[in-house]
């Protein structure tokens, strides 16, 4: 068999993950795990079962439909893991230093407080995303069209470029803060560890260090594709510019189509290595220069612990 053919048939894992606060979460075919570095220096490993493998429902296997549910699952589970990982960084002193208002909320709501705060935070986060990536670019593009004659595609193109610019600018600004920069280092550890596993090398710190922190099957690349594909979907469906609020509502309704297409392209990029997949992966890999950083050994150890917990008993089940 030629080296080219061998390269195409290289093992690709279904395991994916994300960086959390001082740790890494990995998700396999039937279980997930989160490994966090605690303030005392130890690694806290949390594992839980998920529906997958033979138990995977039809809507998680059907092309284009599966992307919608994978996106929603990643969004919800990812936010829960971020919240839990942040809680793990609290020390006894932090818990004792509650304000009177925090103590009152804790007394009144008890165990319900956490889910309520999570729900409110998610709603605010989604609202901010709609404002930044849907309403504002549409508003600016419509304003420009008052002075320059633009076709529908031209307005959608400007809108898309603005969305991508906001995304890159936002990630670049967040990278300036110490805490987010450390999260980006854990993001790099996640990618390097998955790459080591896919090259079927033993998962050790020294082996993981050798691999790149850039990975085609990444949330950063997925977001870029969603923003890019929306340019064409909004043009094809002739989303109205008459009312910006109505336009935003229609774009939200079209989001399942956009995410479904983006997910399938990410799957292709993760499975194959050819000129087409290199082209669709290139922008996302470039943006990963911002959203990932080189990790240290302690961060790699967390990524290894999380990934090892997700490896299925039968490795054949994990083939992409």
Regions found by a protein language model. Give the residues of each.
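Hydrophobic alpha-helical segments characteristic of transmembrane helices
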Residues: 95-147, 153-177
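Juxtamembrane "helix exit" motif at the C-terminal ends of alpha-helical transmembrane segments
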Residues: 84-85, 125-149, 226-255, 259, ...
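Multi-pass alpha-helical transmembrane bundle typical of ion/small-solute transporters
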Residues: 55-58, 68-71, 75-99, 106, ...
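Divalent-cation
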Residues: 1-97
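Hydrophobic alpha-helical membrane-embedded segments
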Residues: 62-84, 159-184, 255-271
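Transmembrane alpha-helical segments and their cytosolic interface motifs
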Residues: 113-131, 211-235
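Polar-ligand-bearing catalytic/cofactor-coordination segments
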Residues: 2-16, 20, 24-26, 40, ...
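Membrane interface segments of multi-pass transport proteins and intramembrane proteases
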Residues: 103-113, 140-158, 238-249, 268-278, ...
